[in-house]
Design a protein with these regions (language model features):
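Gly/Trp-centered helix-boundary motif
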Residues: 1-109, 113-114, 120-121, 128, ...
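Generic hydrophobic transmembrane alpha-helix motif, especially the helices
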Residues: 72, 76, 82, 106, ...
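Alpha-helical transmembrane segments of multi-pass membrane proteins
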Residues: 39-43, 143-147, 160-166, 217, ...
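Helix-loop-helix units of permease transmembrane domains in multi-pass membrane transporters
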Residues: 85, 184-191, 199
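Short alpha-helical transmembrane interface motifs in multi-pass membrane proteins
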Residues: 92-96, 111, 123-127, 154-158, ...
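Transmembrane helix-loop junction
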Residues: 43, 47, 113-117, 146-148, ...
Length: 292
């Protein structure tokens, strides 16, 4: 038995210099990263920025156009400052996207490891559960779950995480299946290493790259899904600022004051586009074979 056979799986590591060099080659990804960082900083600094209260109603100033004195981006149908509501809505969208994708990742990775490493009834149970959830249309199943739990951001995040974790389960299980019979895993098992040690030292390192890539691409999808539920009245509830609910309440004024709909719609578009471009760059960096 050689030491090489017992060596733990390599962990994908990239230096900061290599990351900067890879990003500099992709102008779109760099611009998307800058935009994303600015959005995150604005969202985090919202309580300390000189912005109007996003929930304060000012009926005489309702539906003001952009560049109105005191309202750089105009107001909505209740006279609330759209700039303030967009910034505060970014906090909700980022929380929903990262939180929902994170919850789906934790559940999906755990079930994927269990279903891929262990055989028998455990594997069958995990995969049948995954197949059942993936058999339903994504957003329709989320709507059904929220309808049962009740409207609200927390329940919407739970629902989207439930319908989203099977993606991680299938991804992780496929990786675990490919390495559970490898020589270094068999050698560790023959030497009496317990399963938790084998999983931590030999399996988890192989999962880092695909899971990081999947998560970076999934956050944008989760933001879009939570915005969709809020648009339907099942997510964030009034008067909390949320891009999806801003679209829902402003759509009736799309002809009279199109900025009420265009601004939150543009915010969702740019946020999701930035996340997808950054996710693609992360994928190309961690797995150069995917670069066309």
């Amino acid at each position: 038995m050689t030491d090489a056979a017992l060596a733990p799986a390599p962990v994908v590591r990239g230096t900061a210099h290599a990351t900067r060099r890879a990003m500099s080659r992709n102008v779109l990804a760099t611009a998307a990263l800058v935009m994303l960082v600015l959005a995150v900083l604005l969202a985090l600094a919202a309580p300390w920025l000189p912005l109007a209260d996003p929930d304060t109603v000012n009926t005489p100033a309702r539906l003001q156009p952009p560049l109105t004195p005191g309202y750089p981006l105009g107001t909505d149908e209740f006279g609330r400052d759209l700039l303030s509501r967009l910034v505060w809505g970014a906090r909700v969208s980022l929380l929903a996207g990262v939180g929902t994708a994170g919850l789906a990742m934790v559940v999906g990775v755990t079930l994927g490891i269990v279903g891929g490493y262990y055989t028998g009834w455990i594997e069958i149970l995990v995969m049948r559960l995954t197949d059942i959830l993936m058999a339903f249309p994504y957003i329709l199943l989320a709507i059904a779950i929220v309808a049962g739990l009740g409207p609200g951001l927390r329940n919407a995040m739970i629902a989207i995480a439930i319908v989203g974790f099977p993606f991680y389960t299938r991804l992780v299980r496929s990786v675990v299946l490919s390495i559970r019979e490898r020589e270094f895993v068999e050698a560790a098992r023959a030497l009496g290493s317990p399963d938790p040690v084998i999983l931590r030292r030999h399996v988890l390192p192989h999962l880092l790259s695909p899971v990081i890539v999947a998560f970076s691409l999934d956050v944008g999808a989760k933001i879009l899904a939570t915005a969709g539920l809020s648009f339907l009245g099942l997510g964030t509830q009034p008067p909390t600022a949320d891009w999806g609910s801003m679209l829902a309440t402003g759509r009736q004024f799309v002809v009279l004051r199109p900025h009420v709909v265009l601004l939150p719609g543009l915010a969702i578009f740019l946020m999701v586009l930035s996340l997808n471009l950054v996710g693609d760059a992360v994928r190309d960096f961690l797995d150069p074979r995917t670069t066309s």
